[in-house]
Amino acid sequence: MDPNGSGAGPESHDAAFHAAPDRQRLENVVIRFAGDSGDGMQLTGDRFTSEAALFGNDLATQPNYPAEIRAPAGTLPGVSSFQIQIADYDILTAGDRPDVLVAMNPAALKANIGDLPLGGMVIVNSDEFTKRNLTKVGYVTNPLESGELSDYVVHTVAMTTLTLGAVEAIGASKKDGQRAKNMFALGLLSWMYGRELEHSEAFIREKFARKPEIAEANVLALKAGWNYGETTEAFGTTYEIPPATLPPGEYRQISGNTALAYGIVVAGQLAGLPVVLGSYPITPASDILHELSKHKNFNVVTFQAEDEIGGICAALGAAYGGALGVTSTSGPGISLKSEALGLGVMTELPLLVIDVQRGGPSTGLPTKTEQADLLQALYGRNGESPVAVLAPRSPADCFETALEAVRIAVSYHTPVILLSDGAIANGSEPWRIPDVNALPPIKHTFAKPGEPFQPYARDRETLARQFAIPGTPGLEHRIGGLEAANGSGDISYEPTNHDLMVRLRQAKIDGIHVPDLEVDDPTGDAELLLIGWGSSYGPIGEACRRARRRGTKVAHAHLRYLNPFPANLGEVLRRYPKVVAPELNLGQLAQVLRGKYLVDVQSVTKVKGVSFLADEIGRFIRAALAGRLAELEQDKTLVARLSAATAGAGANG
């Protein structure tokens, strides 16, 4: 979708007089803000997102952070971006490619221009296109003057100069003025898409309430951006994207990490249990710790541990004491927590472990997304150590998935791993706020004094063991990492007992009640099923929509429950002649499905630290139906081998 209505065009220039711009109605637009990590692109994108949410658009966002805390200014490694799609209909992704690119410097332009379709709009801060900044990123000539951007609609705006002029009246320093240029960009885009500034101004004044001079500078920059759009001839068109028709209810914008935190708080209330989070800060999971720390009034306790092991052990101790124990981490942290997680399996304590996956292995790509921890979640502990594993499909779905994970942990007395990922954690979308009073309670029972009690006596239906809070008179007992005797919990090395307890722990997980897998197959006779999990939901769903509009029959199923699987999963897989599993790993789900159900599930893999594009999934659909999918996957390995640097050849050998 071209927001400019006229395809490619020349660079625009200010005119001496102003004519009222044309107003064009659009169904959707994808905008990407890009600049240095210190340019405030995440804040700019977040505020534009809030404006869209208040306006009533459906939306989806995808931030992209540099891995360095602060890379050298003006360099490619330091580019930070924020992409948002807003629409007047239900959308599933933040968009494949931007229609509008806001580039605050040459590095931002160079890093992102390749994603912009021909005819797309580029709005650049021309003040930053100095010879020094151009040289930093390898531009020999200024692309704003050389004609290499002639395939795009380019608007050069001296944002820094105009911002400094706007704040001069209040005597703001040059440094403070330069820092406010992102608000100029926000004001300009708000004018272009008909968004009022009232809420952004209120946000700025609240955020900088203790520094009123900073607040005033940012407000002036915001209004200067709006006024520039109003008074310049450079932008001949403004755009209108009407509100979306969504199911009735009260909505708010929410990120995946925030939704997880809210879900945990509500789950604690529904279960009548205090929540204790033991966690060590790690990208991209730290926001869960930060958000939960704000909710002490809901009986939430947060503990920032000295390391990953301390975090999970504190949560496990809290679970032993009768609380809802929670720990959060990312991939490397899960590796460190594995022994304590095994202790949780052996002691059968209710524990929620959140893994916000990122690129690995080891430190890997801390700020990039991946889905490569599935096998670790399923099997990454010594011995037969089964746990329940769930995965949300979107930021808003994190709330429901957290509730379900806690329900399983408490009802079945088991650790549960919740697999989010960087794309879900940092992305955002509208979330319909639920009526908490209408949510079903999370049931659990504590043993009571005077009643028969054995720590490893089990509920006949769930196989959950009896649970007594330590210190309850008459219910003294012991549990630990050594094998326990069936019923009494006494330490036992007896072979038959160990065999029994291993099978009971496995049967408990296998017997967890999960709903049947739903399949999106409008015609009921598709030849191809795409099966996914986690954040691939949006790209797969959007690709299926596009394919169906072209007359292709394709079905989509998405797994929330990864252990145990839905009971009807095998039947669903066998229903379709062709089954493809797109994953941000090297085929982990496909490997599990092939082994368990003996179905020829083909893999579509991507490990670039970024999410699938719907266009990519569309190509995979066409290749699968044409019988060429295996060739595409083999080609990826071949290209990797041919591209490998070899001894004596250098990095590009």
Curated annotation (Swiss-Prot):
InterPro entries xrefs: 2-oxoacid/accept_OxRdtase_asu, PFOR_II, Pyruvate:ferred/Flavod_OxRd, Pyrv/ketoisovalerate_OxRed_cat, Pyrv_Fd/Flavodoxin_OxRdtase_N, Pyrv_flavodox_OxRed_cen, THDP-binding, Transketo_C/PFOR_II
GO cellular component: peptidoglycan-based cell wall; plasma membrane
Disruption-associated phenotype: CoA-dependent KG oxidoreductase activity is absent in a mutant strain deleted for both genes korA and korB, and this strain is impaired for aerobic growth in the absence of sufficient amounts of CO(2). Inhibition of the glyoxylate shunt or exclusion of exogenous fatty acids alleviates this growth defect. Simultaneous disruption of korAB and kgd results in strict dependence upon the glyoxylate shunt for growth.
Catalysis performed (reactions): 2 oxidized [2Fe-2S]-[ferredoxin] + 2-oxoglutarate + CoA = succinyl-CoA + 2 reduced [2Fe-2S]-[ferredoxin] + CO2 + H(+)
GO function terms (MF aspect): 2-oxoglutarate synthase activity; magnesium ion binding
Metabolic or biological pathway: Carbohydrate metabolism; tricarboxylic acid cycle
Family annotation (CDD domains): TPP_PYR_PFOR_IOR-alpha_like (cd07034)
Biased composition (Basic and acidic residues): 11-21
Keywords: Oxidoreductase, Tricarboxylic acid cycle
Gene Ontology annotations of biological process type: response to oxidative stress; tricarboxylic acid cycle
Gene3D superfamilies hit by this protein: 3.40.50.920, 3.40.50.970, Pyruvate-ferredoxin oxidoreductase, PFOR, domain III
Chain segments annotated as coiled-coil in the UniProt record: none
Enzyme Commission no: 1.2.7.3
Region (Disordered): 1-21
Additional facts recorded: Is extremely stable under aerobic conditions.
Chain's role: Component of KG oxidoreductase (KOR) that catalyzes the CoA-dependent oxidative decarboxylation of 2-oxoglutarate (alpha-ketoglutarate, KG) to succinyl-CoA. Methyl viologen can act as electron acceptor in vitro; the physiologic electron acceptor is unknown. Is involved in the alternative TCA pathway that functions concurrently with fatty acid beta-oxidation.
Subunit and partners: KG oxidoreductase (KOR) is composed of KorA and KorB subunits.
Listed name of the protein: 2-oxoglutarate oxidoreductase subunit KorA
Lineage: Bacteria, Bacillati, Actinomycetota, Actinomycetes, Mycobacteriales
